[in-house]
């Protein structure tokens, strides 16, 4: 009975959680059938109620662990007292109760075994105590309540947007405002390329060249016939195509000059279509002369077109000169086909890109201006904090003087007034 009275256990009265009152949603879900299931809108309420049950169970578990630890400590202290009492009895020479079985065990082991000293029974009893209170199962791990760090993560994500602006960020904005080197490439229109008919003709010639080379390898006879065709390369193919184009591109009237050159010459030459008959006598031509002349001018020579070198370069130079004199309008871009849908779409997207680039550049300039203004305000706020510290130092000095029951000196008063006026001037700059 005395041991029970000395027992330090508190025997807590655990209050059970009223599920109906504190966890109504949890109780309702348990009363349902498996087919009903749980709705999505009920998950938040269920989570809160389950956390309430978990916290209650964790609290009870901690109390039980504390009680177990108290009981273990009390038993250890009680055993230590018994060991001390046993050691004192050994020193006084009093007989030990229940010592016969121990002596028999010691005698059975050997005659050279010494009797139990004052320290040996204590170690053996400690081992018995450890075996008595040895837990067979592992202690139950207390489930930790998950830490709700959502606010910390939120403020950590918001902090970069609320922090002070640095010089590195100003430099980044200035670098963004610089015009990229490849910006002009986005507004260039790629060349149209060769027409499909020309490309097909070139491919056909190259194909014939390859076929000729293959057939030339098969036999010596065919090699003699197709040899020149097999030795053609891509440059020869292009020259052949250009030659054929030049033959087909001759104007109907046989004049090699361009339209601009012809118009310029027509404007400069005076026309005199009707002339008096007296001024232009028709010479009589004899039969021989006419026969010889007729023989000399054959129909083939009359049908041969007139050719002149460098007609294209002459056309270009005349056009440039007329544009320089202001007689012709300059064509910034070549004539375009109105039915070219790809080119129209490309120009549309280029116009949108140009407008978007201008808008982005204006916004970046506005952002840079606001960032520089904010940098100035940050410097003013830093000066306000320094002025606040000076005002507080002056206030502490004056309060220390009053606690010592002495009047503040003129220097301390002037320093306080100076700090106040400086702070007020900085605040005006900050508000302005």
From Swiss-Prot:
Residue ranges with Polar residues bias: 293-305
Keyword annotations from UniProtKB, A to Z: Coiled coil, Nucleus, Transcription, Transcription regulation
Subcellular location: Nucleus
Superkingdom of this protein's organism: Eukaryota
InterPro entries to which the protein is assigned, alphabetical: Histone_AcTrfase_su3
Listed GO CC annotations: nucleus
Main location as per UniProt: nucleus
UniProt-annotated stretches for the region Disordered: 88-127, 275-313
The keyword Coiled coil is assigned to this record: yes
Keyword check for Transcription regulation: yes
Coiled-coil residues: 40-69, 367-407
Family: Belongs to the NGG1 family.
Role of this protein: Functions as a component of the PCAF complex. The PCAF complex is capable of efficiently acetylating histones in a nucleosomal context.
Protein name: Transcriptional adapter 3
Primary gene name: tada3
């Amino acid at each position: 009975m005395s041991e029970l009275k000395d027992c330090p256990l508190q025997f807590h009265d655990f209050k059970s959680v009223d599920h109906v009152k504190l966890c109504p949603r949890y109780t309702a879900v348990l009363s349902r059938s498996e087919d009903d299931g749980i709705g999505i809108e009920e998950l938040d309420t269920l989570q809160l109620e389950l956390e309430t049950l978990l916290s209650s169970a964790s609290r009870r578990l901690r109390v039980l662990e504390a009680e177990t630890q108290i009981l273990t400590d009390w038993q250890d202290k009680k055993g230590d007292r018994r060991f001390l009492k046993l050691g004192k009895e050994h020193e006084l020479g009093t007989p030990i109760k229940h010592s016969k079985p121990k002596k028999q065990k010691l005698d059975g082991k050997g005659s050279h075994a010494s009797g139990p000293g004052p320290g040996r029974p204590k170690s053996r009893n400690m081992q018995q105590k450890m075996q008595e209170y040895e837990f067979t199962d592992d202690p139950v791990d207390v489930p930790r309540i998950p830490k709700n760090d959502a606010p910390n993560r939120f403020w950590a994500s918001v902090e970069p947007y609320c922090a002070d602006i640095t010089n590195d960020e100003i430099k980044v904005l200035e670098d963004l405002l610089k015009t990229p080197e490849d910006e002009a490439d986005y507004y260039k229109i790629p060349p149209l390329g060769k027409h499909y008919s020309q490309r097909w003709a070139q491919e056909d010639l190259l194909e014939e060249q390859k076929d000729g080379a293959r057939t030339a390898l098969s036999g010596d006879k065919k090699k003699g016939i197709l040899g020149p065709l097999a030795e053609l390369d891509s440059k020869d193919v292009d020259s052949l195509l250009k030659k054929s184009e030049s033959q087909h591109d001759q104007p109907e009237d046989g004049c090699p000059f361009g339209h601009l050159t012809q118009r310029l010459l027509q404007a400069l030459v005076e026309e005199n279509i009707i002339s008096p008959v007296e001024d232009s006598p028709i010479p009589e031509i004899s039969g021989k002369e006419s026969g010889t002349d007729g023989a000399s001018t054959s129909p083939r020579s009359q049908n041969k077109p007139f050719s002149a070198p460098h007609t294209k370069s002459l056309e270009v130079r005349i056009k440039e000169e007329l544009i320089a004199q202001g007689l012709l309008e300059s064509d910034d871009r070549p004539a375009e086909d109105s039915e070219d849908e790809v080119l129209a779409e490309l120009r549309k997207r280029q116009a949108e890109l140009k407008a978007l680039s201008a808008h982005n550049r204006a916004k970046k300039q506005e952002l840079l201006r606001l960032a520089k203004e904010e940098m100035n305000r940050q410097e003013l706020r830093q000066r306000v904090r320094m002025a606040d510290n000076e005002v507080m130092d002056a206030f502490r000095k004056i309060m220390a003087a009053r606690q010592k029951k002495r009047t503040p000196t003129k220097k301390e008063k002037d320093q306080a007034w100076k700090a106040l006026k400086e702070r007020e001037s900085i605040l005006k700059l900050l508000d302005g």
